[in-house]
Curated annotation (Swiss-Prot):
It is an enzyme of class 3 (hydrolase). The active site is at 322 (proton donor). Substrate binds at residue 221. One of its GO terms (molecular function) is nickel cation binding. Keywords: Cytoplasm, Hydrolase, Metal-binding, Nickel. Residues 131-570 form the Urease domain. Heterotrimer of UreA (gamma), UreB (beta) and UreC (alpha) subunits. Three heterotrimers associate to form the active enzyme. Its cofactor is Ni cation. The modification N6-carboxylysine is found at residue 219. Binds 2 nickel ions per subunit. It comes from Brucella melitensis biotype 1 (strain ATCC 23456 / CCUG 17765 / NCTC 10094 / 16M). Ni(2+) 1 binds at residues 136, 138, 219, 362. This is Urease subunit alpha 1. Pathway: Nitrogen metabolism; urea degradation; CO(2) and NH(3) from urea (urease route): step 1/1.
Length: 570
């Protein structure tokens, strides 16, 4: 006879099911379970007296006979594709199956086999997301990787050589020698990583050698001279090699105005960094580029969301990052031209509309690498409070808004940089770069981070304790962050040209190299999932007011944000 239990008891035992609602951290964002791929009465759970035991939920089948390496049980998946509950089977470091796990000899409807060789990760009451992808990283210090991984980021794309002054300001690694050294360093860093070469040149030769040396993209930055000639040349090289171009345009409008930059694009696909402009770009109207079908517009997190402190902190940040002097009036004028409350306020709304497609960090160069995910959800929460529910949200939940915002740091950056065949979503066939969250700590402090199907970092107590939880309890590197496990569970993204030239053997790295694909004409703004709006944009050159399809975009700064001091005492 089937037994009935209360919804609350069920959720406590097996996690939420269809119709149950979950609050994300301390925000006002509520998600609702849309479907459940597990079977009531046949749920699998590990532990003493539980289901996953020999002859019960655990079969006799070997790995060769179809048993998984790892199963995450009863997980609530939050992905751009939907919000649903399922068991997740991992094999060879990839997501092999999503559905119902158990023992096919004793249970009906089993698609994911648990065998004697299967490890179990308890997903009951946990939210599972794809690992975050940060596509605007200044590689100033390797310690950024620890901060990023512990925040739920599993892929970092950017450039640099360490605390050199070129790197402090610009997100690119200049030349094949530096690119090789940086890629070699990745063998010691538990993270999927890609490198931008410097894209500022008016002739192709130097850019071509950087792509062949392992750059998975090129970065154009105003501090190196972002002229129409450099833009045109860089995009031509990118088209030839199928790599993405990221751009930080000319704030001072010395080499041309935003129209000149758009003309230099010639309709070719490009990733526009900090499209609002406080992070850099044509003053005051770089924000207009989000209306074009070939531009993939992004924000960096220092302006996310617009708060009472946003303007005040930017001036000093900018002076330091771009090697400016407070003693030089022209330097101060340059800095002040980039910081406009009107465009920052509009940026909040453009994200909520889905007109801005990506959020990244700008790590240690005006942005905080460990706060990319936090700032994204703070923006979503602020917009719900100020603008209400989105038209596509159903009464009682914020599922559509949640899917829109998670896409900004998972699938959309993966698509933009030719990595979506490997990462960016909780999807069968992709790498098992997954993050488990306690809902109360969602977006703030992960419960566990998997790289290539193995645990890379997790909260852990005193290693001399009799159990894993005695204080001090904090996030620590796990076995996936050491030795050859590290190099076998994370990858480096490069160009296909570098693969063809045998880069891995040439520079002697252990990590697997994976080529980026489909970064050029095959993608555009239409490819940005749930974030492909292209409103007609106008910016008043005197008041800086921003309009989209004729509507004034403005909102008030907030003085309190969620996911903040409640979670961080120090």
């Amino acid at each position: 006879m089937p037994a009935r239990i209360s919804r609350a008891t069920y959720a406590q035992m097996f996690g939420p099911t269809v119709g149950d609602k979950v609050r994300l951290a301390d925000t006002d964002l509520i998600i609702e379970v849309e479907r459940d791929l597990t079977t009531y009465g046949e749920e699998v759970k590990f532990g003493g007296g539980k289901v996953i035991r020999d002859g019960m939920g655990q079969s006799q089948l070997s790995r060769a006979e179809g048993a998984m390496d790892t199963v995450i049980t009863n997980a609530l998946i939050l992905d751009h594709s939907g919000i649903y509950k399922a068991d997740i089977g991992l094999l060879d470091g990839r997501i092999a199956l999503i559905g119902k796990a158990g023992n096919p000899d004793t249970q009906p409807g089993i698609s994911i086999i648990i065998g004697p060789g299967t490890e179990i990760i308890a997903g009951e009451g946990k939210i599972v997301t794809a690992g975050g992808i940060d596509t605007h990283v200044h590689f100033i210090s390797p310690q950024q990787v620890d901060e990023a991984l512990n925040a739920g980021i599993t892929c970092m794309v950017g450039g640099g050589t360490g605390p050199a002054h070129g790197t402090l300001a610009t997100t690119c690694t200049p030349g094949p020698w530096h690119i090789a050294r940086l890629i070699q360093s990745f063998d010691g860093l538990p993270m999927n990583i890609g490198v931008f070469g410097k894209g500022n040149a008016s002739l192709p030769g130097a850019l071509e050698e950087m792509v062949r040396a392992g750059a998975c993209g090129l970065k154009l930055h105003e501090d190196w001279g972002c002229t129409p000639a450099a833009i045109d040349n860089c995009l031509s090289v990118a088209d030839h090699f199928d790599v993405q171009v990221a751009i930080h345009t000319d704030t001072l409008n010395e080499g041309g105005f935003v129209e000149d930059t758009l003309n230099a694009f010639k309709g070719r696909t490009i990733h526009s960094f900090h499209t609002e402009g406080a992070g850099g770009g044509h003053a005051p109207d770089i924000i207009r580029v989000c209306q074009y079908p070939n531009v993939l517009p992004a924000s960096t997190n220092p302006t996310r969301p617009y708060t009472v402190n946003t303007i005040a902190e930017h001036l000093d940040m900018l002076m330091v990052c771009h090697h400016l002097s407070p003693a030089i009036p022209e330097d101060i004028a340059f800095a002040e031209s980039r910081i406009r409350k009107e465009t920052i306020a509009a940026e909040d709304i453009l994200h909520d509309m889905g007109a801005f497609s990506i959020i990244s960090s700008d790590s240690q160069a005006m942005g905080r690498v460990g706060e990319m995910i936090i700032r994204c959800w703070q923006t979503a929460d602020k917009m719900k409070k100020q603008r209400g529910s989105l038209p596509d949200d159903r009464p009682g939940n914020d599922n559509y808004r949640a899917r829109r915002y998670i896409a900004k740091y998972t699938i959309n950056p993966a698509i933009a940089h030719g990595m979506a065949h490997e990462i960016g979503s909780v999807e069968v066939g992709k790498r098992a770069d997954l993050v488990l969250w306690n809902s109360a700590f969602f977006g703030v402090k992960p419960d566990m981070v998997l790289l290539g199907g193995w645990i890379a970092t997790a909260p852990m107590g005193d290693a001399n304790g009799s159990i894993p939880t005695p204080q001090p309890m904090h996030t620590r590197p796990m076995f996936g962050s050491f030795g050859k496990a590290l190099t076998n569970t994370s990858i480096t993204f490069v160009s296909q040209a570098a693969m063809d030239e045998g880069l891995r053997e040439k520079i002697g790295v252990d990590k697997q190299l994976v080529a980026v694909v489909n970064t050029r004409g095959g993608i555009g703004k239409h490819s940005m999932i749930l974030n492909n709006a292209m409103p007609q944009m106008e910016v008043d050159p005197e008041t800086y007011e921003v309009r989209a399809d004729g509507e004034l975009l403005t909102c008030e700064p907030v003085d309190v944000v969620p996911m903040a001091q409640r979670y961080f005492l120090f």
